[in-house]
A protein has these predicted regions:
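Register position in tetratricopeptide repeats
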Residues: 286, 320, 496, 530, ...
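Serine-dependent acyl-ester chemistry module
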Residues: 106, 161-354, 358, 366-379, ...
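Short coil turns that delineate tetratricopeptide repeat
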Residues: 152, 305-306, 339, 481, ...
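Start-of-helix register in tetratricopeptide repeats
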Residues: 309, 485, 519, 553, ...
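Membrane/wall-proximal cationic-aromatic binding patches
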Residues: 35-120, 373
């Protein structure tokens, strides 16, 4: 029979042994299963520059293991070591901040970056896109410390639409609804390698057995409805306020400037789900019988004071009759009463403004700005694609508001750029056709399934595109082609098709996204030169050479331009360097061009014998090179 001490020891061993095994398994997984490591950022290198790249798969910890689709972060790059010469801005939010339906140059972060680089060319401007589809303030509050660790100078917040259907919104377990702190503990537990391994194994099994369409809106909402003023709505919006305060304090405690915005949506978009649809009303509105429609709706309103469709059609009827104030009131009620809460109710914006006032954080009234710029002061299709994602023009308005607030605050570096913001046009903002057409495809796919019904989105760019252009944008949408390759392919096609401005815009979009790549700068410089924009061409050539000093083609092109401008000393240095780089290589034409350029310099400075010698070498390398033949003939004719 065991003594008391031995019995206690046996019990301790029986308890500790499994824990030790789990600890050993955890340590083993950390050493021998690196794929389970999922840091927020990873080190990367661009040429010789040490960078940090955002882990696009980081959001998996916030979604159930059996989720068919897990949203991703944009895998942006920033310098690993932030110096005084770097001004870093983080754009944080949901799908609207991500840029849906766009991917490249028409998003809020891209437009903010473009304007800041225009206004402040001296510092290196980094604008990182930390928006993602289907996330909410629960996720952002958890991410905030990791974001703050990366030392941004400013954080721009645009979030509030996904509070109901984002992670642990209405779908949170009942115990987490009672004790919200458990949500944070759950996220921490998912950092444990054993938990992560179990999640991935379960997720792989579950996803392999799932059929049907991949619909993120259906997946995150599960069709759950929420009534206006219900206890669940009050809980979710209250939690949003707590999270927002926590997010702001996380950054402010580190001395990081925060600029928030309220959120906006289309009031002209009908509710997704309501108590009744009132099928007899839309035909009356469509046929112009507004007074009759209004009378019927007022009767219906008396029987149900909180029906979204009743209020929506009341708003439409009042708008048609010219009563814009009443129209706006009913349309706002309809949005708030929509049982499917994909648009933030008015209470969300009230919370945003209230928290920002309490925390002394500037808050941009984007919803008011959109209303002021919309027909009759009612937001709709002029600035929105569907229920809440803005068009390129809408995103530009939000970006301008953020930049304007940054200028007003004393946080930006000294300006050495052009006065005033760039205008909203494709050339100034480098809005590539490829990205804008991608938006049309993306919206068509989004609105062609639940919860949308009978929604037709315009696609003027796709409708007027040729087959090759349509194929290129379709391939990038289907992920058959990556964005960099697609942009290079598209720009080359447009260039060969004689549409130089479109190619220039696309190269510009690539440069904004990948500023450390020399090749888009070289091609853009060549097109600007051919278009006669010599000043911008020279600036772009210089940047390309700074990124790749061994690129002979950029050196030759710049040398020839400088010769024509009378800057002979620098031109000689550039062209001589190009000859050194191409020496011993089978590159007769570039070498012939460099020799021709040196001949032109000699001719312009009066050294005719040396000019002829360089021309002889140029024609030896490329006997049919016309510029060398013409210059030689001119020199000989002048000598006679």
């Amino acid at each position: 029979m065991l003594s008391g001490k031995r019995r206690l020891l046996f019990r301790l061993i029986s308890v500790l042994f499994p824990l030790v095994l789990l600890l050993l398994l955890e340590v083993s997984l950390r050493f021998f299963a690196p794929s389970l490591d999922s840091p927020f950022v990873r080190e990367a290198a661009v040429d010789t520059v040490r960078m940090l790249q955002v882990n696009r798969a980081y959001l998996e910890r916030y979604f159930p293991a059996n989720a068919p689709m897990v949203p991703e972060l944009k895998p942006g790059l920033m310098r690993a070591r932030k110096t005084k010469g770097v001004f870093r801005v983080f754009c944080v939010g949901e799908s609207s901040m991500l840029g849906t339906p766009y991917e490249l140059s028409a998003t809020i972060p891209a437009l903010v970056r473009k304007q800041l680089r225009h206004l402040f060319p001296a510092p290196e401007i980094e604008v990182m896109n930390f928006g993602a589809s289907a996330i909410n303030s629960n996720v952002v509050a958890d991410l905030a410390p990791s974001l703050a660790d990366l030392s941004p100078d400013a954080v721009l917040l645009y979030l509030g639409h996904n509070e109901f259907y984002g992670p642990d919104g209405v779908g949170a377990p009942w115990i987490e609804k009672k004790f919200p702190a458990l949500t944070e503990l759950k996220y921490r537990a998912r950092d444990i390698r054993i938990v992560r391994l179990a999640q991935r194994m379960l997720g792989s099994f579950m996803r392999g057995s799932q059929d049907g369409e991949r619909n993120l809106m259906k997946q995150v909402s599960r069709g759950a409805t929420v009534e206006a003023g219900s206890a669940e709505e009050v809980r979710v919006i209250g939690r949003f306020g707590e999270n927002l305060r926590r997010i702001i304090k996380t950054f402010r405690d580190r001395g990081i400037c925060v600029i928030a915005s309220d959120v906006t949506s289309s009031l002209m978009f009908p509710p997704f789900i309501s108590g009744a649809r009132h099928e007899e009303i839309p035909p009356l509105i469509a046929s112009g019988n507004f007074t009759e429609a209004l009378g019927r709706l007022e009767v219906l309103k008396g029987t149900d004071t909180a029906d979204a469709f009743t209020d929506y059609w009341l708003g439409r009827a009042h708008l048609a009759l010219g009563d814009t104030r009443e129209a706006a009131r009913f349309l706002r009620r309809a949005r708030d009463e929509d049982l499917l809460k994909f648009r933030a109710p008015a209470r969300t914006d009230s919370i945003i403004h209230s928290v920002c006032r309490e925390e002394s954080v500037p808050c941009i009234a984007v919803d008011s700005i959109f209303s002021a710029l919309s027909p009759a002061g009612i937001t709709g299709a002029t600035l929105f694609w569907e229920h809440l994602h803005p068009t390129a023009r809408g995103y530009d308005i939000i970006a301008r508001a953020f930049v304007g607030e940054m200028i007003r605050l004393p946080i930006l570096p000294p300006s050495g750029g052009e006065p005033g913001l760039l205008p909203f046009d494709a050339d100034s903002l480098s809005l590539s056709w490829l990205d804008l057409a991608y938006g049309e495809i993306s919206v068509r796919a989004l609105t062609g399934r639940w919860p949308f019904t009978d929604f037709i989105s315009p696609s003027p760019l796709l409708d007027s595109a040729d087959p090759a252009e349509r194929k290129m944008v379709t391939d990038v949408y289907l992920k058959k082609t990556g964005w960099t390759d697609a942009c290079l392919q598209f720009a080359s096609y447009e260039e060969k098709s004689g549409r130089a401005r479109e190619a220039i815009r696309t190269y510009g979009a690539l440069i904004e996204e990948y500023p450390f790549e020399y090749y888009p700068r070289y091609r853009r410089a060549a097109l600007l030169r051919d278009e006669g924009d010599i000043t911008r061409a020279v600036a772009e050539y210089r940047r390309a050479i700074a990124l790749n000093p061994a690129h002979a083609y950029s050196l030759i092109d710049l040398g020839l331009i400088l010769n024509n401008a009378g800057e002979f000393d620098e031109a000689r240095v550039r062209l001589s360097r190009a000859l050194e780089l191409t020496g011993g290589k089978d590159l007769p034409l570039p070498r012939a061009q460099a020799c021709y350029g040196l001949a032109a310099i000699c001719a312009n400075t009066g050294d005719i014998p040396k000019a002829l010698a360089w021309l002889d070498e140029s024609l030896r390398l490329a006997p049919s090179y016309a510029p060398a033949r013409q210059l030689r003939a001119q020199i000989l004719a002048h000598a006679r």
